[in-house]
């Protein structure tokens, strides 16, 4: 396909750095082997990855040569500490008692990391909520307008996670 070509990653990063503001994040989707190329092209800005579980596997034509693919990588890049607003979900078990502890330490750059506890409880602790995990499940859209189209709900999730209200996307 004409649209599915190798992009110039040096030019891509030059433009991303030009438009990235403050503690903004660059969030990209990829599949192997491009995932590895993308991370390697800017390891300094790479933060971590999520896994998007599509719930339905693809790749039936290659099923006799390799496993079906049911996930894509979501790669997060940024300069310094990026905005992160965890999208908590309702705990199906309801309110649970959890052991909490205080911790704080300095990272290699001398920044204080860890949660500042107030009265022994994390200031963002909600007993009936669960913090996100790196594997997120979103069904693919039934009638996509593009072969690589991502689900609207996945994009909303990422926008809510990596931006504050009224931020530019």
Describe these PLM feature segments.
Residues 40-169:
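Class I S-adenosyl-L-methionine
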Residues 2-59, 72, 76-77:
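Conserved Class I SAM-dependent methyltransferase catalytic core
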């Amino acid at each position: 396909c004409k649209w599915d070509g190798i992009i110039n990653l040096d030019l891509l990063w030059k433009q991303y750095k030009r438009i990235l503001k403050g503690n903004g994040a660059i969030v990209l989707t990829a599949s192997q082997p491009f995932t590895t190329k993308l991370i390697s092209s800017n390891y300094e800005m790479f933060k971590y990855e999520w896994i998007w579980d599509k719930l339905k596997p693809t790749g039936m034509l290659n099923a006799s040569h390799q496993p079906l693919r049911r996930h894509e990588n979501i790669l997060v890049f940024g300069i310094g500490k990026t905005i992160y607003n965890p999208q908590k979900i309702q705990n199906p078990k309801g309110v649970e008692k959890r052991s909490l502890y205080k911790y704080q330490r300095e990272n290699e750059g001398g920044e204080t990391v860890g949660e500042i506890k107030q009265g022994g409880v994390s200031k963002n602790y909600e007993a009936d909520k669960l913090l996100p995990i790196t594997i997120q499940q979103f069904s693919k859209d039934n009638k996509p307008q593009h072969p690589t189209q991502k689900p609207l709900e996945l994009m909303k999730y990422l926008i809510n996670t990596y931006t504050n209200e009224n931020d530019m996307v």
